[in-house]
């Protein structure tokens, strides 16, 4: 067919190749889409004939550009690409020899070149952009069909232009095959193809890719068979039918047409009709136009050509006038034609678009109106094939509309009426079919859940009047589940609201017909709760729930929680706390398990009046305590601390109540994770003095399995929410056998581990709501999921400030978050939990220790505080949530100031003494609230007193920052002090309060102290504080966000934040000053300060901060393992905190918990609880396990950048215990905390009660130590002092000189420790002395203090700091006590010299500083003992830590061990883990 020589083939031969018109047709069709050259068939034919390399090369380059989707292929560089594609497509895919292997394209035979060109057209249709470029084209319109055939079987082909080809079927298969293939390809009637549709190709048009390929494959097979042997001219190859050009001139067209005129066969008559009517007239016009075109073309090209060739200038000049005229005229005509064409095309396109949109709208209307039937079909996945396309189009239109709206542009009419005009309501119309389908699926799921409920049987079928007389007379709109299912099946529910309304109607009918007290009504209530749960589960992202529904659900949940709390003994408080006033009113009586405190809290939460709060809380605490003790029976007949916490919580509704009250599910229980119920471990441990004897062991033992305990666990969380007191309880509870025994394997973090809180996202703490600035999630995000109470604890602090709002927020706390957050703190703080390990006598002995359980010192004060600062007690717990006491201390001192420093706090401390009796367990503490028996009481009281003394300033606006902090809780309770209230939100009392509160909260330290604490922190915190508590909280959160544990950060309450931050800073400084962990530690105010700011930060929160520092050390392990210093045990701890963050409230708290292996008891609460989340280096309870140095806690980096990014680098496991600050209770809790610390912090002082004296930096040990000791005493005795000490310690770590002094001054200035002592009725000095002497400074010796503060070892210093920070929680001091007692070995070293630099965590033994031997011996002592039992190493103690009194977390730690606190203490001294034992509280 093609001459073998590369020369030009004869025209006749060329015209016999159908590929030539096919190529020309392809280029004509897709010229615009594929950017192909514009030419006619004749031009291509001429170029091939002349062997026009330029023309052919340009065409090939354009085709290859499309095939390879690149624009750098030119006529000069196309050869390599051509060879590549032919090699792949032609040779590999089709198996034909690659002709380009032996010769270049130009050297190939013409026939082969034509075939290659034709194949390139096919390949171009396989490119990636074809779909997009041709999506608007119809395949049928592109396909070339024969015009017809005659009797002989010859086919007549028209491609385009003015040519018609004839294919004779004569020779061969080629022809026959071709014709067959064409026909098979869809050869249609000649009439089916408009005259100009086709191109020149006669065969299978290139139009359709598949057809083309079929044709080509056939052709090429023929060619391969015939081309080699054949050297034919013409189209008469052996296997090729003859193709030849039938006609191209007007005359030829007429002749061919006439030749069919007389034909008789149907085919030929049809062909004639088509040619004569459709083609001939058009072809004649085209030919006429074509005749003019060449002249025009010449005219156009001539001038150009001439301009290119100057040699022709003369000719050009001659022709110029004529050519110019012709050219202008021609161009004008062409332009007019083009404009007309464009206008026509545009109109056509617009018309098509309109029709398409109209069609879509009609379909949409049909779809919506026919939804009933369609929905049923949807459920069977039997959608019509066109629906997905329609939906895709509708979605695209919606997106386009949304984009235009977002740009503020006007919507075209077609986009402004996307919704079908149907009689349906607008809401129905807005739903897309997709959404409706999803809603239907969800409705079916909800209905299935409801039907499967055990109480659904009365509602499954329509009511029969045979057993329900006159039913249909009373009920006008009957409804039942089967009827709803029928409606659903029938597609009658167009919106979720209709479905919900029917369900509500059913429940309403039941209530209306059966009455309120009917069994059926109760069943309907159960079913309704089930329904709401299912709705929330299956309609997750919906914000369609009305406020009414939300509150109904909240009420139901609260009711549920109440009943659960009743069972657990004190878990109801949280539920009650949910609403500021409602919580008290509902939960107050019975829910609390007979705690009047909830009411107190409610009163404060309602924000009725601070003063009332301050007075009320004490009273309530007393009552509540009494009741609480009753309630605590869970614990084995002793008042449950959880109840007490609850009581306290009422005082601080936002802090505790709301959290707890917010959502039964919110707490651990809510999350679905086994939650420690308030009645459980904590409650078991709750009884202060009583409990140690009765509850300690029994609690310990039963804790895991006791239902109460479980409730306690939940309650704990709630308790934590309750504030320092509950927090402590919680810690204890958690620390002991896990409240949900099964929930946390004893091996993990049973006792203090609060991980159970995992169950739910932390709802924003009740107290948080008030401080909207600090989203609950920020506060407790970190552990939020773990504890669900994280925020609550901090919120306790925060809540204190947000007491009123908290009430309602409690509901928001639906998630475990808010409610549980305090509880989490509680866990960590739960001195009781920690305390239980201490022998009953020890507990008594450590009034301060148990007292935290007894509201008198810590909790007491909180109640007092509650009275004065409704939230104060809880706030303190909140701040100390993280570390238990520290939180409270923080609150009292900084955030804690509001508690301790305010008159209310003082009153509370006094009340604490009184409350102690109500909280019988605390009676030792209670009488001498400030100076409970033993150092602990002293510490606790001094802390309390300190806070209280300054607290006297509670009403002390002058003390606005501190006071405000302190009052914050109060505000939450009753009135929002501007600063306070602000603080609650900003500081979030939970979070900001700590951070800010730390600086701000210590009334004694006052803002000055806070600010003095650390210029940096103050800079951040101060401003935040100043600007607004809410802001502060948020900032804290933000800062925290920087921390590895943002969530933790979120969780930690102000106290937690502050404490944590301090701790973190301490830990950072002490341990590694890890990458600004300290800075992080002070996310609140000095997040960016880095390590250096750690000291400042600490200063910032002398009390709270110090606490925080201590806690961070602890929390660090748990909370900041990953980001913070892995070397710090924190690695594990860190991991663990975010998840677990037992201190939920204070992720930092969790970090604190984790911070030190020792803190594991606490840490576990935080991290331990979420062992999974925070695998933590320390296995279950073994912070040590991760603790690179038992003494070093990984700094606690709140996942969310807690206010206090306290990332004590290597705080030993104690730091977890440092969480002891968790013990938010002023004295009792403080004492508890103290034990907690020894337990949790080998370093000595638990994070919960890191006394400011405890310098954050080791290097500061000497100075800070002495000073710290004093400060610690002061802090213990007075929150202000604590703050000062805390500040000092941090400063010591960084700038010991000025800042420390400043801090000290400011702390003392606002309210000197003496003041606190006096206020406490426990003479701060006496208490301090007792505390120091007994425990040789809670954290041991001044040196330890220094180390603690400086976090030299970063483990206990935070502890120490925490102790200081948590004066409200003397227990923090007990941390050191614990150390001494819990770890007799560490006690020796810790008590005397915090220098604990020897401690594993590198901190001076903080335990000693606070180690009121008596107090410390209590709770923490037990922990320490356990640790000693486990004393095989830090790990042992850590583990012990984790398994607080009753916890079996560490086999090593035996319950007996706790009683042997002294031994444990010793152990702790040698091993920082001794502090970790402090954590046991947390570890439930």
From Swiss-Prot:
Compositionally biased residues, Basic and acidic residues: 210-222, 1304-1320
GO biological process annotation, one example: inner ear receptor cell stereocilium organization
Gene coding for it: CECR2
Modified residues (Phosphothreonine): 546
Post-translational modification Asymmetric dimethylarginine, affected residues: 1197, 1203
Region (Disordered): 170-241, 556-704, 796-825, 919-1053, 1165-1259, 1287-1320, 1442-1484
Compositionally biased spans, kind Basic residues: 197-209
Source organism: Homo sapiens (Human)
InterPro entries cross-referenced by the UniProt entry: Bromodomain, Bromodomain-like_sf, Bromodomain_CS, CECR2
Location(s), subcellular: Nucleus
Full protein name: Chromatin remodeling regulator CECR2
Role noted for this protein: Regulatory subunit of the ATP-dependent CERF-1 and CERF-5 ISWI chromatin remodeling complexes, which form ordered nucleosome arrays on chromatin and facilitate access to DNA during DNA-templated processes such as DNA replication, transcription, and repair. The complexes do not have the ability to slide mononucleosomes to the center of a DNA template. The CERF-1 ISWI chromatin remodeling complex has a lower ATP hydrolysis rate than the CERF-5 ISWI chromatin remodeling complex.
Domain named Bromo: residues: 434-538
Positions with biased composition (Low complexity): 605-614
GO cellular component entries: CERF complex; euchromatin; nucleus
Expression sites (tissue/organ): Highly expressed in skeletal muscle, thymus, placenta and lung. Expressed at lower level in brain, heart, colon, spleen, kidney.
Self-association state and partner proteins as the record states: Component of the CERF-1 ISWI chromatin remodeling complex (also called the CECR2-containing remodeling factor (CERF) complex) at least composed of CECR2 and SMARCA1. Component of the CERF-5 ISWI chromatin remodeling complex at least composed of SMARCA5/SNF2H and CECR2. LUZP1 is detected as part of the CERF-1 and CERF-5 complexes in embryonic stem (ES) cells where it is involved in complex stabilization but is not detected in the complexes in the testis. Interacts with CCAR2; CCAR2 may form part of the CERF-1 and/or CEF-5 ISWI chromatin remodeling complexes in ES cells.
Polar residues bias (residue ranges): 223-234, 1451-1469
Keywords on record: Bromodomain, Chromatin regulator, Methylation, Nucleus, Phosphoprotein
Pfam families named among the record's database cross-references: Bromodomain (PF00439)
Molecular function, one GO term: ATP-dependent chromatin remodeler activity
Stretches with biased composition (Pro residues): 1243-1254, 1474-1484
Principal place of residence: nucleus
